[in-house]
């Protein structure tokens, strides 16, 4: 808060404008009105003043309110004593003083309807106006104060030589540099280097304003005291008042019995009220003692001390606390403390007290250098909750450590670290984290990588492991290490491109075979074999660890023209495996070898597969019009031929491979599998066409794509345990029709859809449709409506150790946890944030699973938002995941909660910060809405 009074120099050399200040010695003190005399400097250095006309022809002197002169030594008149006393700011109950101006213009307040377009763009959507600093001379002056002259302007002036008192009256303005003081009347005491301002006092400086009845200014230091004061910080939308405001020489402002709020002048929705409030513009923070948080002038919270921001700068201190209550934690209070250690690094401590669990200490350290950025974090809790005491892998000494880092040792060598470790797999299910970048997935990442970027190649050394954060999944493979080199040769003889991909990687995991107990200490028979880990369901060569070496050189000949392109390409993929398998896996592999879709174990396997493709396309366009709008319509046919011979790959385990889902883009891929462990055999011709409607300004109004693949042979290469003869789509002569349609009503409305229809079964294979509305000029309005259907999912069932195709079941028929079509997707999702009356919005979301006839999430509530505070009240139902069983469906249980969020703008969230997370995740457009809000 750069709140400063004019720091006039010791002898205050004055440039007098609009009035006359007599500084030369006179026999007697008298008043001279500038509008009645012409004055010039005489030869002796004094003033030579001549009347404009004979004195006896002067009209009677008019009486001007606010321009009458009084001597600094004269006693107050009886009339002054009987005048009404000014209204005190303490009587305003947090509002601006209407006695100073009915429309609060004395605080530079401008109603919303009077703001310019540029000012509206900088004003929050629910603010009734803004504090606009008026343009004035010198407001952008950056001249040092000790080098700046002082300008004084007044209607009339008087100087008493013997007392060395200068008196100014009528629209008094004193300015030095960027600072300006205004008043009805001023007395300047030259001998004491101080001044007195009386009546409608205003002191301005660099985006701040202090208004009062009287002020005392020390002219040589700039120290000042303003009585019955109101203050405003224009850009921060901050205002307040005090019995008096003191400005020290170093520009620190101290308020006696002061207030602080971001509410509009006519509102007392909330305010901080303290005996002593200090605002430090040098640090950008304020402090207050004996503070009460008042809502509608009713005290709701007390603290003996508080530390708060007055601008956007960082500073060490307590952040706004948050509290909540849940069944897992009980009442929870978080009191973060921020450490502003340096401009490029900081730290935050999050003490989190939970009545059911104890005190969780969590902290993070962030850093930023010229070549890197990242954060270190950790947490510790001695958990006194014993609900999981008997459950496998539970630890009551709970902890988490993490490190995220991205940087470059030079312009070519890049470094990356994403490492998280936790004490037990239930950490994120039971506890929350306030650290940035920490995600609660089924596994936590433990990765470090070095990347070298050459002129024509990229080399990468990667080490990646995973820590389990659930019991209901199979232990994944670690890559320890992985080396890749991908690039292109720097020369192109005859227009040919030569590229290559190489990889050497070690896959390793430690499958567990111990018993699993539930929270009661009983064996968990829900999913594992005989109460053992789910890892025991992994069988045969799927249990193998090993090394994989892959080399894939390619040669292509791109031929391009303005009307189209043709690119033939030949790639050769060579892969070598060195495998090791435990005794259990070898026995199971022997038994499985006779079954379709399974292979036998070999410690060394090599595979080489050629891949030939020809990608081609044409481009046509024409000018057209639709509904009175001119467009350029394009027509872009595409043809893609792919030939890959069949290679038996059933002896190869899956380390990082799965089958991709069918869509329009998959028509033009050279492998229907992700990863390297499977290369799909193909002999197909894909045909597709895309058309676009593009406006004259380049805006793409809509586009439509349709395509289909023609197969000339069956697709025999499959995932383990899957026989291509049992898959109709592996034997079909044609692929499903793939359609994509996108329509952009304008830059605010859009409709995105895709549809895949199987002509063999005459049924929908998959599809989705999503409508999104969010006006660019009013992003507070959000509407989302979507539907998605997929009956061709390919998933690994951890309870059986097999792959399921086509929306498969969970478990086997007859099992207690069997669920038919568990992996099939058929859902709708509707969400809306919509203003119903000014400052009131409705918030709702409904996500429903038709396949299992259940609601995944439903919430509804309202939001009140204005310029200084926000309130949200939301009733929410959702499917929660609490890992008490190895059977994933048993861990899915409905939960319900009523969430209240209160945000005091300028202080932060007081309660209910968790609301932000599920609104951000559940409603598309919510983050954009919040980013533009004040």
From Swiss-Prot:
Keyword list, A-Z: Cell outer membrane, Membrane, Signal
Statement: the UniProt record of this protein carries the keyword Transport: no
Region (Disordered): 52-86
Coiled-coil annotated residue ranges, if any: none
Disulfide bonds: none
A Pfam family assignment: LptD_N
Superkingdom of the organism of origin: Bacteria
UniProt record, GO biological process: Gram-negative-bacterium-type cell outer membrane assembly; lipopolysaccharide transport
Residues making up the signal peptide according to the UniProt record: 1-33
GO cellular component: cell outer membrane; transporter complex
Subcellular location(s) per record: Cell outer membrane
Subunit relationships: Component of the lipopolysaccharide transport and assembly complex. Interacts with LptE and LptA.
Family that this chain belongs to: Belongs to the LptD family.
Task performed by this protein: Together with LptE, is involved in the assembly of lipopolysaccharide (LPS) at the surface of the outer membrane.
Stated name of the protein: LPS-assembly protein LptD
Gene label: lptD
């Amino acid at each position: 808060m750069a709140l400063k009074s004019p720091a006039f120099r010791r002898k205050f050399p004055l440039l007098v404008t609009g009035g006359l200040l007599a500084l030369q010695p006179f026999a007697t003190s008298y008043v001279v009105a500038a509008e009645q005399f012409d004055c010039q400097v005489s030869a002796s250095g004094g003033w030579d003043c001549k009347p404009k006309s004979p004195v006896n022809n002067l009209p009677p002197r008019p009486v001007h309110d606010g321009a009458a002169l009084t001597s600094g030594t004269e006693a107050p008149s009886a009339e002054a004593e009987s005048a009404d006393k000014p209204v005190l700011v303490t009587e305003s109950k947090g509002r601006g003083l209407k006695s100073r101006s009915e429309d609060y213009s004395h605080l530079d307040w401008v109603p919303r309807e009077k703001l310019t377009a540029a000012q509206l763009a900088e004003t929050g959507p629910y603010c009734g106006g803004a504090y606009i600093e008026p343009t004035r001379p010198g407001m952008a002056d950056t001249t040092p104060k000790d080098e700046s002259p002082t300008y004084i302007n007044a209607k009339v002036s008087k100087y008493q030589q013997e007392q060395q008192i200068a008196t100014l009256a009528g629209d008094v303005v004193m300015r030095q540099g960027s600072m300006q003081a205004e008043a009805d009347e001023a007395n300047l005491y030259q001998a004491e280097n101080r001044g007195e301002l009386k009546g409608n006092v205003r002191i301005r400086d660099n985006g701040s304003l202090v208004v009062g009845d009287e002020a005392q200014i020390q002219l040589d230091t700039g120290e000042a005291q303003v009585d019955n004061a109101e203050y405003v910080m224009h850009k921060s939308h901050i205002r307040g008042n005090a019995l008096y405001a003191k400005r020290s020489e170093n520009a620190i402002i101290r308020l006696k019995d002061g207030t602080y709020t971001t509410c509009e002048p006519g509102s007392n929705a909330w305010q901080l009220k303290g005996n002593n409030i200090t605002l430090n513009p040098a640090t950008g923070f304020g402090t207050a003692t004996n503070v009460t948080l008042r809502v509608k002038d009713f005290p709701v919270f007390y603290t003996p001390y508080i530390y708060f921001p007055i601008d956007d700068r960082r500073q060490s201190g307590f952040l706004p606390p948050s509290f909540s209550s849940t069944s897992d934690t009980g009442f929870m209070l978080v009191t973060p403390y921020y450490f502003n250690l340096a401009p490029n690094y900081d730290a935050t401590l999050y003490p989190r007290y939970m009545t059911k669990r104890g005190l969780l200490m969590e902290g993070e350290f962030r850093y930023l250098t010229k070549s890197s950025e990242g954060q270190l974090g950790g947490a510790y809790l001695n958990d006194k909750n014993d609900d999981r005491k008997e459950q496998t892998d539970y630890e009551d000494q709970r902890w988490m450590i993490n490190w995220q880092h991205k940087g470059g040792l030079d312009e070519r060598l890049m470094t990356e670290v994403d490492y998280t470790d936790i004490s037990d797999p239930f950490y994120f299910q039971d506890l929350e984290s306030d650290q940035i970048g920490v995600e609660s997935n089924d596994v936590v990442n433990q990765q470090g990588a070095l990347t070298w970027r050459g002129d024509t190649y990229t080399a990468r050394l990667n080490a990646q492991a995973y820590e389990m954060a659930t019991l209901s999944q199979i232990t994944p493979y670690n890559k320890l290490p992985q080396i890749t080199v991908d690039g292109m040769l720097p020369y192109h003889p005859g227009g040919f491109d030569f590229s290559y991909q190489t990889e050497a990687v070690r896959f390793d995991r430690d499958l567990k075979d111990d018993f699993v107990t539930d929270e009661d200490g009983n064996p968990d028979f829900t999913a594992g074999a005989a109460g053992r880990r789910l890892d025991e369901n992994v069988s045969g060569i799927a249990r193998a660890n090993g090394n994989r070496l892959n080399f894939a050189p390619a040669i292509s000949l791109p031929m391009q023209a303005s009307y189209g392109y043709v690119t033939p390409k030949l790639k050769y993929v060579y892969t070598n495996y060195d495998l090791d398998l435990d005794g259990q896996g070898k026995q199971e592999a022997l038994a499985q070898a006779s079954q379709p879709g399974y292979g036998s174990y070999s410690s060394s396997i090599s595979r080489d597969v050629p891949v030939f493709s020809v990608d081609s396309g044409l481009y046509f366009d024409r000018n057209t019009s639709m509904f009175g709008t001119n467009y350029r319509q394009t027509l872009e046919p595409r043809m893609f031929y792919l030939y890959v011979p069949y290679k038996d790959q059933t002896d190869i385990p899956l380390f990082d491979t799965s089958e991709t889902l069918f869509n329009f883009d998959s028509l033009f891929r050279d492998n229907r599998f992700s990863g390297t462990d499977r290369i799909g055999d193909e002999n197909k011709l894909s045909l597709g066409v895309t058309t676009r409607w593009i406006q004259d300004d380049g805006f793409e109004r809509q586009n439509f794509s349709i395509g289909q693949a023609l197969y000339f042979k069956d697709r025999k290469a499959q995932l383990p345990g899957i026989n291509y003869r049992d898959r109709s789509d592996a034997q079909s002569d044609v692929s499903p029709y793939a359609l994509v349609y996108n329509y952009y009503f304008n830059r605010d409305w859009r409709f995105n859809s895709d549809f895949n229809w199987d002509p063999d079964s005459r049924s929908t294979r998959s599809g989705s449709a999503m409508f999104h509305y969010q006006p660019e000029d009013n992003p507070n309005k959000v509407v989302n409506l979507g539907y998605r259907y997929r009956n061709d999912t390919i998933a690994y069932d951890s309870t059986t150790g097999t792959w399921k195709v086509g929306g498969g079941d969970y478990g086997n028929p007859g099992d207690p946890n069997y669920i038919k079509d568990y992996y099939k997707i058929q859902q709708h999702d509707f969400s809306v944030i919509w203003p119903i009356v000014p400052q009131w919005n409705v918030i709702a979301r409904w996500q429903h699973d038709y396949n299992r006839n259940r609601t995944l999430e439903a919430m509804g509530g309202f939001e009140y938002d204005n310029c200084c505070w926000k309130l949200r009240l939301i009733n929410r139902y959702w499917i929660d995941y609490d890992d008490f069983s190895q059977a994933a469906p048993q861990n899915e249980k409905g939960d319900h909660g009523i969430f209240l969020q209160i945000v005091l703008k300028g202080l932060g969230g007081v309660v209910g910060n968790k609301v932000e997370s599920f609104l951000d995740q559940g409603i598309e457009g919510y983050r954009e809405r919040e980013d533009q809000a004040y």
